[in-house]
Swiss-Prot record:
Catalytic activity: ATP + H2O + 4 H(+)(in) = ADP + phosphate + 5 H(+)(out)
Name assigned to this protein: ATP synthase subunit beta 2
The protein's assembly and partners: F-type ATPases have 2 components, CF(1) - the catalytic core - and CF(0) - the membrane proton channel. CF(1) has five subunits: alpha(3), beta(3), gamma(1), delta(1), epsilon(1). CF(0) has three main subunits: a(1), b(2) and c(9-12). The alpha and beta chains form an alternating ring which encloses part of the gamma chain. CF(1) is attached to CF(0) by a central stalk formed by the gamma and epsilon chains, while a peripheral stalk is formed by the delta and b chains.
Gene name as annotated: atpD2
EC number(s) per entry: 7.1.2.2
Gene3D superfamilies attached to this UniProt entry: 2.40.10.170, Bovine Mitochondrial F1-atpase, Atp Synthase Beta Chain, Chain D, domain 3, P-loop containing nucleotide triphosphate hydrolases
Family: Belongs to the ATPase alpha/beta chains family.
């Protein structure tokens, strides 16, 4: 990355990741990068213009070794990202520097990460479904091609597992480019994901960008824009569809909160930055479909203390076309993926887009599961026998639907010992319809647990009947 450093200033204050500098001549522009250190290894982004020729910047690298009186140079350019065919199959940091122990890619161009979203006249209004191969998502909360989907959940309910399974299912069948952006997540998870994708042979059409949790908040705050700049190149310049996976949007908001506090801005509710809505919109509005191609985004969103009224979750909800909510209660019951079928929603679940049969089945499933939730208190107090015959049938259907919507994942196969399943939409709909029609009312619930399609359930039932007939009487 080439930078022209011709204007110099002096460091006057260093407070953690915040650096104040004085420029006697021309002031550096907002968002311009300042370089300090013997080898320009300390990078600071200008965030505020103060009075008297002073600027305040946010460090994108650790500031160890920086002292008052040191020289700091204006690069004359904002943060930039490499774009081009050569970035495929590589792993980068926020500066576009490779972190996969290989030489920098050749023939790349550099673009500013601070670009405007596509104009309204450039955007596509076409709506179509994006198949994931996961039953609970495709049936009850289908994703939109060129839309934004959020995976909401607290700590330990399976957000990262679900997003890695989505990568596994979609990267192989996805004809465009897949781009994974890790914001403030564990280095170990990124390394495991890189290794899995390389072994699966899908790394050649994938780009990975990381701003890890041990990096300064400035790097975590900007790494999403670096990834988006790369995604926009493939969408606009090459006309290729892009699958953008982000883990975790909450860490982006959290990094902005840290920067806001260090800059001395007045906090808003629960300590969040007053500009949270604007900052999130700047990121989310660049994820869109145009007449050239589409960027489809799936984003993990950590929900602090499982509180869905938290401002970070509330602000994120409004940008999404599908919200997939993960439930701690379902996870504790062993119903994986722990997707809450009643809380999860999708804007495209209407008969004009998904078809009359899909819409009707999804509504019937929700109605059955909602009635079961209402009956749980009565069952706990009085027992199942006190329910009417029709209510008992609803309970039996709901329990079988809950188990059928579970699914073994390829990415957890080494832990569970169960072969992963990718289920076609028709197979998922046929299974739900059969259960709603009481086809499995006499069968044990366990044959529907952790399977793909109904053929597996029928095979299990035949095996149980064979085993039962083969037993000798006592």
């Amino acid at each position: 990355m080439k930078r022209q450093a011709d204007r110099s200033g002096t460091v006057v204050a260093v407070r953690g990741g915040i650096v104040d500098a004085r420029f006697d001549g021309e002031m550096p522009a907002l968002h311009s990068l300042l370089l300090a250190g013997a080898q320009d290894e300390i990078v600071v982004e200008v965030m505020l213009h103060l009075d008297g020729g002073h600027v305040r910047g946010n460090a994108l690298t650790p500031t160890q070794g920086l002292a008052c009186g040191d020289t700091i140079k204006d690069s004359g350019a904002p943060l930039q990202a490499p774009v081009g065919q050569a970035i495929l199959g590589r792993v980068f940091n926020v500066f576009g520097q490779p972190i996969d122990r290989r030489e920098p890619p050749d023939g790349c161009r550099w673009r500013s990460v601070l670009t405007k979203p596509a104009g309204l006249t450039e955007r596509s209004s076409k709506t179509e479904m994006f198949i994931t191969g996961i039953k609970a998502i495709d049936v009850l909360a289908p994703l939109e091609r060129g839309g934004k989907a959020g995976l909401f959940g607290g700590a330990g309910v399976g957000k990262t597992v679900l997003i890695t399974e989505l990568i596994h299912n979609m990267v192989g069948q996805h004809e465009g480019v897949s781009l994974f952006c890790g914001i403030g997540e564990r280095c170990r998870e990124g390394e495991e994901l890189f290794r899995e994708m390389r072994e699966a042979g899908v790394l050649d059409n994938t780009v990975m960008v990381f701003g890890q949790m041990n990096e300064p908040p400035g790097a975590r705050f900007r790494v999403g824009l670096t990834a988006l700049t790369m995604a926009e190149y493939f969408r606009d310049d090459q006309g290729r569809d892009v699958l953008l996976l982000i883990d975790n949007i909450f860490r982006f908001i959290q990094a902005g909160m840290e920067i806001s506090g260090l800059l001395g801005l007045m906090p808003s509710r629960l300590g969040y930055q007053p500009t949270m809505g604007t900052e999130l919109a700047e990121l989310q509005e660049r994820i869109s479909s145009t007449r050239h191609a589409a960027i489809t985004s799936i984003q993990a969103v950590y929900v602090p203390a499982d509180d869905f009224t938290d401002p970070a979750a509330v602000h994120t909800f409004s940008h999404l076309s599908a919200s997939i909510v993960l439930s701690r209660r379902r996870a504790s019951e062993g119903l994986y993926p722990a997707i809450d079928p009643l809380a999860s929603t999708s804007n495209i679940l209407n008969p004009r887009i998904v078809g009359e049969r899909h819409y009707r089945l999804a509504q019937e499933i929700r109605r059955t599961l909602a009635t079961y939730e209402e009956l749980k208190d009565i069952i706990a107090m009085l027992g199942l026998e006190e329910l009417s015959r029709e209510d008992r049938r609803i309970v039996f259907r709901a329990r079988r639907l809950e188990r059928f919507l579970t699914q073994p994942f390829h990415t957890t196969q080494q832990f569970t010992g169960m072969q992963g399943r990718t289920v076609a939409l028709d197979a998922a709909l046929n299974g739900c319809e059969a259960i709603l029609n009481d086809e499995f009312s006499e069968a044990p619930e366990k044959i529907l647990y952790m399977i793909g399609g109904l053929e597996e359930a029928r095979q299990r039932l035949r095996e149980e009947e064979t085993a039962g007939h083969g037993e000798e009487p006592p």
